[in-house]
From Swiss-Prot:
It catalyses: a quinone + NADH + 5 H(+)(in) = a quinol + NAD(+) + 4 H(+)(out). It is found in: Cell inner membrane. This is NADH-quinone oxidoreductase subunit C. Belongs to the complex I 30 kDa subunit family. It holds the Pfam family Complex1_30kDa. It comes from Legionella pneumophila (strain Corby). GO terms for molecular function: NADH dehydrogenase (ubiquinone) activity; NADH:ubiquinone reductase (non-electrogenic) activity; quinone binding. InterPro entries: NADH_DH_suC, NADH_quin_OxRdtase_su_C/D-like, NADH_UbQ_OxRdtase_30kDa_su, NADH_UbQ_OxRdtase_CS. SUPFAM superfamilies: Nqo5-like (SSF143243). NDH-1 is composed of 14 different subunits. Subunits NuoB, C, D, E, F, and G constitute the peripheral sector of the complex. It is a peripheral membrane protein. One of its GO terms (cellular component) is plasma membrane. NDH-1 shuttles electrons from NADH, via FMN and iron-sulfur (Fe-S) centers, to quinones in the respiratory chain. The immediate electron acceptor for the enzyme in this species is believed to be ubiquinone. Couples the redox reaction to proton translocation (for every two electrons transferred, four hydrogen ions are translocated across the cytoplasmic membrane), and thus conserves the redox energy in a proton gradient. The keyword NAD applies.
Length: 227
């Protein structure tokens, strides 16, 4: 029995009533739970001998807005314009029937040498999650970062302030509906002799990635690419 198989067996035996989903893919074990079950699950994962997850190595927010939608919705590939890099795909957009936001935790057991991902989805209308700072001190800045970038509140955090943006920043820049160029920019005004906020003067534009073609313009007579 591998380490992951042992871990899955123990999770199913001990936490079946608290988790809503358990998956294993690419050598990673992931469990999902509801917000109200987060702390009981985390306490068990930290304190039970068979788990012994003594370290929280990462915590992040995720915004699933438009998850799985096509970036380029065009009917055909052309030699110019926005659709020139289109490749037809049989796969359709993913259907996600879960809340828009999620919080993801990565746990490590230095005793058992195994890892676990814990995920919980949070309703957009009530973006509040219990803090795990009292369980792992490393959660302090992780939770502040998730609050700053996504607007997720962590109930019980001792100092939930912005971490990466400045004090007067409005909004949460890692949300998918936040403008890429931002809302305002900060600059020094020589007349006022102070730093001010002003609307961004960046003109929105579409950036098309480099397209590598494999057609007759680049294929030699022998069927290989020309140097």
């Amino acid at each position: 029995m591998t380490k992951n198989e042992y871990l899955i067996e123990k999770l199913q035996a001990d936490l079946a009533n608290h988790i809503t989903e358990l998956t294993s893919a690419y050598g990673e074990v992931t469990i999902e739970c509801e917000v109200q079950n987060l702390l009981p699950v985390m306490i068990e994962l930290r304190d039970r001998e068979e788990f012994s997850f003594d370290q929280l190595i990462d915590l992040c927010g995720v915004d699933y807005l438009h998850y799985g939608d096509y970036d380029w919705e065009t009917e055909s590939a052309t030699e110019h314009g926005f659709s020139r890099g289109v490749e037809r795909q049989e796969a359709k957009a993913y259907a996600v029937n879960k809340p828009r936001f999620a919080v993801v935790y990565h746990l490590l057991s230095t005793q058992k040498n195994h890892r676990l991902r814990v995920k919980l989805f949070v309703e957009e209308s009530h973006l509040i999650v219990p803090s795990v700072h009292h369980l792992w001190k490393s959660a302090n800045w992780f939770e502040r970062e998730a609050y700053d970038l996504y607007g997720i509140l962590f109930d019980g955090h001792p100092d939930l302030r912005r971490l990466l943006t400045d004090y007067g920043f409005i909004g949460h820049p890692f949300r998918k509906d936040f403008p890429l160029s931002g809302e305002v920019e900060m600059r020094y005004d020589a007349k006022l002799q102070k730093v001010i906020y002003a609307p961004v003067d960046i003109v929105p534009r579409i950036v098309v990635p480099k397209v590598i073609r494999n057609d007759n313009r680049y294929i030699g007579n022998e069927g290989s690419k020309n140097d």
